[in-house]
């Protein structure tokens, strides 16, 4: 049996930009992508802490070191600049993989700077 498990999470990311006219996606600072082992064009689930919205899109690379979290296209309707997001990726795993698996959690602070990286 396969289970869909949390693979990585950027916790309390702050939206820095929202561009309704862009063709879609979520731009994420490359440093944050590396820290969470997330990849460009990977599907992500986003949870808006401020308003409870839940939505999905895909990743595009943001400028390294910028702290960028930009919502583009339809996703820009789901959050405002300054809103806090939880950004997650999931992966299918079999029972053997699940037994000893720990997701990668990246806790963010002001300016989307990394406060802590942990496996829960």
From Swiss-Prot:
Key words, A-Z: Autocatalytic cleavage, Cytoplasm, Decarboxylase, Lyase, Pantothenate biosynthesis, Pyruvate, Schiff base, Zymogen
EC category name: lyase
Annotated GO MF terms: aspartate 1-decarboxylase activity
Record-listed E.C. numbers: 4.1.1.11
Main location: cytoplasm
Positions of transmembrane segments: none
Cofactor note: Binds 1 pyruvoyl group covalently per subunit.
InterPro entries recorded: Asp_de-COase-like_dom_sf (IPR009010), Asp_decarbox (IPR003190)
Active-site residue numbers: 25 (schiff-base intermediate with substrate), 58 (proton donor)
Catalyzed reactions: L-aspartate + H(+) = beta-alanine + CO2
Binding site residues for substrate: 57, 73-75
The keyword Cytoplasm is assigned to this record: yes
PTM remark: Is synthesized initially as an inactive proenzyme, which is activated by self-cleavage at a specific serine bond to produce a beta-subunit with a hydroxyl group at its C-terminus and an alpha-subunit with a pyruvoyl group at its N-terminus.
Family: Belongs to the PanD family.
Cited function: Catalyzes the pyruvoyl-dependent decarboxylation of aspartate to produce beta-alanine.
Assembly and interaction partners: Heterooctamer of four alpha and four beta subunits.
PANTHER family assigned to the protein according to its UniProt record, in alphabetical order: ASPARTATE 1-DECARBOXYLASE
Protein name as it appears in the record: Aspartate 1-decarboxylase
